[in-house]
């Protein structure tokens, strides 16, 4: 488990996009990478939060620079898993619902994402899920969907109190298809906006599946949070 850290002097030896890793000046980092609405929200302003079904909240979090640079880092590192159940990265060596993905700790972005969850995502979660408190992060990674590789994900519940998903590229331009179907609610979530975050309850109520990506490559961040 990853718990909250107050350390903001975080750097990485990644070869590209070093500024994304450097959160030593948090205000400068926010200026570079947060969506303008979320920056306004941090300063006491308003933010657009959509709730299309009960307890699913979508809001603008990152700008497109963040999304593009993170995709570039993931492809430069090229540490994608094979999408099989056996996974040596996990303590028990087994993933029940595997995806083709790269964990943030594989690219040196785990501490940064930890800070993003506690500083930004948790602020929205604790407004939407009244009475909840974000205490730790179970796992965080970027998933890659392609027609020739893993193109969808079977129905499942997440191993989390709540989960966060962030779209990193554009439906209709970078890929076709995709999205998430919440089965019990009979609702398909098809965001087209890179940098928008969706949060929803994990292990109990929001049974869901990843819909087929039929063209191009779809990238999303997934984070399981307690």
Regions found by a protein language model. Give the residues of each.
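Short non-domain terminal segments
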Residues: 9, 19, 36-39, 60, ...
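Acidic-enriched, low-complexity/disordered segments with a strong bias for Aspartate over Glutamate
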Residues: 13, 22-25, 40, 82, ...
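A generic signature of intrinsically disordered, low-complexity regions enriched in glycine/proline
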Residues: 26-29, 44, 105, 160-164, ...
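Catalytic core of non-heme Fe(II) oxygenases with the double-stranded beta-helix
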Residues: 114-226
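Non-heme Fe(II)/2-oxoglutarate
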Residues: 34-133
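Homeobox/homeodomain signature
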Residues: 11, 19, 47-52, 87-94, ...
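Fe(II)/2-oxoglutarate
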Residues: 1-57
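Intrinsically disordered, low-complexity regions enriched in Ser/Pro/Gly/Gln/His and often acidic
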Residues: 20-22, 73, 106, 138
């Amino acid at each position: 488990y990853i718990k909250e850290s107050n350390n903001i002097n975080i750097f990485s030896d990644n070869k590209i996009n070093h500024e994304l890793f450097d959160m030593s000046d948090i205000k400068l980092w926010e200026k570079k990478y947060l969506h303008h609405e979320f920056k306004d929200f941090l300063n006491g302003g308003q933010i657009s939060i959509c709730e299309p079904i009960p307890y699913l909240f979508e809001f603008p979090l990152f700008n497109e620079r963040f999304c593009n640079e993170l995709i570039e880092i993931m492809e430069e590192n090229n540490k994608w898993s094979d999408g099989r159940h056996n996974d040596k990265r996990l303590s028990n060596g087994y993933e029940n619902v595997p995806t083709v993905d790269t964990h943030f700790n594989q690219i040196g972005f785990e501490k940064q994402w930890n800070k993003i969850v506690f500083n930004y995502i948790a602020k929205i979660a604790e407004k939407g899920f009244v009475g909840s408190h974000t205490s730790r992060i179970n796992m965080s990674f970027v998933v890659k969907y392609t027609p020739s590789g893993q193109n969808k994900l079977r129905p499942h519940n997440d191993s989390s109190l709540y989960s966060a998903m962030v779209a990193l590229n554009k439906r209709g331009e970078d890929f076709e298809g995709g999205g998430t179907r919440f089965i019990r609610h009979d609702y398909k979530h098809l965001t087209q906006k890179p940098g928008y975050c969706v949060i929803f309850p994990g292990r109990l109520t929001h049974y869901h599946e990843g819909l087929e990506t039929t063209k191009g490559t779809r990238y999303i961040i997934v984070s399981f949070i307690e």
